[in-house]
A protein has these predicted regions:
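Short, ordered, surface-exposed loop/turn motifs in non-cytosolic proteins
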Residues: 268-287, 308-310
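Hydrophobic/aromatic-rich core segments of domains that either
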Residues: 29, 109-110, 114, 119-125, ...
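Secondary-structure boundary elements
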Residues: 29-149, 184-185, 406-521
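A short, amphipathic beta-strand motif
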Residues: 259-270
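Extracellular beta-sheet/turn segments enriched in Thr/Pro/Gly and aliphatic residues
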Residues: 242-254, 327-368
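Short, acidic Ser/Thr/Gly-rich low-complexity loop/linker segments typical of extracellular
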Residues: 284-306
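Short Pro-Gly-centered beta-turn/loop motif in secreted/extracellular proteins
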Residues: 301-313, 317-320, 327-330
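C-terminal motif of bacterial Sec signal peptides marking the signal peptidase cleavage site
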Residues: 24-26
């Protein structure tokens, strides 16, 4: 992994120097695969540099450039749109996979002969055939994992749909409101760039027209909507923050009239405070949620465009804090001064009214005939997806699919059913665990994992963790709960599960066996 990172860092430097020389010499040229890969490596995280090979990113870049050449709308895409909203493989914090390279031909055929606008609508219909909404945990499934199981929460549906749009060269980005202002919870969806402008759609929730979704009215009451753009992006939208890897932008203006909020922070003596933290908070789930935190500039100010509703402000610096309320029902600048007049160990009682934006209207037009036709399509797409999910393991066929005569058959069958589209990998794992006389331990290990883990983890990853946990015979197994939860369990937090356990075991084993201190543990 470290060698891979070092190799790619040196290669990235060489490619960047070459590109700089070409620019300085005035030799503008069409983007090449090397240019595209260089851009990806310039801004990707160190984890992605280590987890995925150069060939992986090269293959994805080749397909992205192919889409730009072959799709009729490719000529509309300038380099900025292409680099930031088509080329990147990553959408959120999902595991990267081969979705783009596997499904380019399929999706290209699906949109053949369509305009860019109609292609975006059609891709969303395809996504609906494959995935529907189901709540789950915070870890984001990859596009192929969502397809495998036919389901995903809104963040996974939107990750999947963005990947599909980008595959055919349609610029797309995942947009989310960190918290609704008028009700609890949040939501994520997709924006697509078609024919010169950004429009929104509900991911895997196709409508007959863009800018139509079940959340049109909720969106009209939102205070903030933002998206993470891969790389150092300099577009027309407000920038919330820049990092080495991405640019966070505010796109609330695409949905509602906005106001500019200006917060000036002063200390208890009236002097402006630079570098203070200013949290712009939305009331949700019984808390003041810091949707955005900014630093004050040299004038002691921080500003943010939002919807037209109340917003609580929390400012802090140097062990002191203060609060304020942004309130106006008009699309005009709203300015307040927050004084840091409380010590951070001091409790504070606050009695305020928080008013969300009033319901508005986001225009969306579709004829009654188009709406009726869309409903028929949705029903057909549901039937296609349900026909696929009907192939998953159930109580009727579980024992036959398992094919093991064991006292643990009931528990093993339950895991096959829970595995949904991943049942073949889980079956292979249990068969191999049984071959190693470790089926009981394997089933206990599966019980430590989330349902999502069961539904997208490969056999080799699970078997690697199981075999390595069974190796150290000096570990006391008298307290099985501790052994199962803290030795056998392959997951630590939200990391990608990888087959690394045996590598570590083979490295450390020579230092452990024969070591009396280790044997006393």
């Amino acid at each position: 992994m470290l060698q891979n990172i070092k190799h790619m860092t040196l290669k990235q430097l060489a490619l960047t120097m070459t590109a700089t020389i070409l620019v300085l010499s005035g030799c503008a040229k069409e983007m090449t695969v090397n240019d595209a890969v260089s851009f990806l490596y310039e801004y990707m995280s160190i984890a992605d540099k280590g987890d995925y090979s150069e060939d992986f990113f090269k293959a994805n870049a080749e397909v992205a450039l192919k889409a730009r050449r072959e799709m009729p709308w490719g000529k509309q895409l300038n380099d900025q749109l292409f680099k930031h909203f088509v080329l990147p493989v990553r959408v959120n914090n999902e595991r990267l996979d081969d979705f783009r390279t596997m499904y380019y031909d399929t999706l290209k055929a699906r949109v053949n002969g369509l305009s860019m606008h109609d292609a975006a609508l059609e891709i969303n219909h395809w996504c609906h055939e494959k995935v529907t909404y189901t709540p789950s945990d915070a870890r984001t499934s990859s596009p192929l994992a969502s397809m495998l199981n036919g389901e995903g929460r809104c963040g996974e549906e939107s990750t999947f749909t963005v990947a599909a749009m980008r595959t055919v060269g349609i610029p797309a980005r995942q947009v989310y409101t960190p918290r609704w202002a008028h009700t609890d919870d949040n939501h994520a969806w997709v924006e697509v760039w078609t024919d010169g402008k950004w429009s929104f759609l509900g991911a895997c929730e196709p409508e007959p027209e863009l800018n139509m979704a079940w959340f049109n009215e909720p969106a009209s009451r939102a205070m903030l909507m933002h998206t993470l753009v891969f790389g150092d992006y300099d577009g027309p939208e407000d920038v919330i923050r820049r990092t080495e890897n991405f640019t966070e932008i505010n796109v609330i203006g695409n949905y509602v009239k906005t106001r500019r909020n200006i917060v000036t922070v002063k200390d208890s003596t009236g002097n402006i405070v630079t570098g203070a933290n200013v949290g712009f908070c939305i009331y949700n789930y019984g808390e003041m949620f810091p949707a955005v935190t900014l630093k004050t500039d040299k004038n002691g100010q921080a500003s943010l465009h939002t919807g037209i509703g109340d917003m609580f402000v929390w400012a802090s610096s140097g062990g002191s804090y203060g609060t304020g309320l942004l309130h106006t029902d008009r699309a005009e600048d709203c300015e307040i001064v927050v004084t840091l007049d409380h010590n951070d160990t001091e409790m504070m009682d606050i009695d305020i009214d928080i008013n969300p934006p009033a319901p508005g209207r986001i225009p969306a037009e579709a004829s009654e005939a188009a709406v009726a036709a869309n409903k028929l399509r949705l029903a057909r797409e549901d039937s296609l997806r349900l026909a696929y999910t009907a192939t998953f393991t159930d109580e009727v066929n579980a024992a036959e699919r398992l094919g093991l005569a064991t006292e643990y058959s009931d528990a093993a069958c339950k895991q096959l059913i829970d595995a949904k589209g991943n049942w073949r990998e889980i079956r292979e794992f249990m068969v191999k665990a049984n071959d190693n006389d470790l089926l009981r331990e394997g089933l206990e290990m599966l019980k430590t994992l989330s349902r999502k883990d069961i539904r997208d983890t490969k056999c080799d990853v699970l078997l690697d963790a199981l075999i390595s946990a069974a190796k150290p015979n000096f570990i006391s197994k008298n307290n099985e709960n501790i052994y199962f939860d803290f030795v056998l369990c392959p997951r630590i937090h939200g990391e990608f599960l990888q087959p690394f356990h045996m590598d570590i075991w083979n490295t450390l084993a020579p230092y452990i066996y024969g070591n009396e201190e280790a044997n006393e543990v």
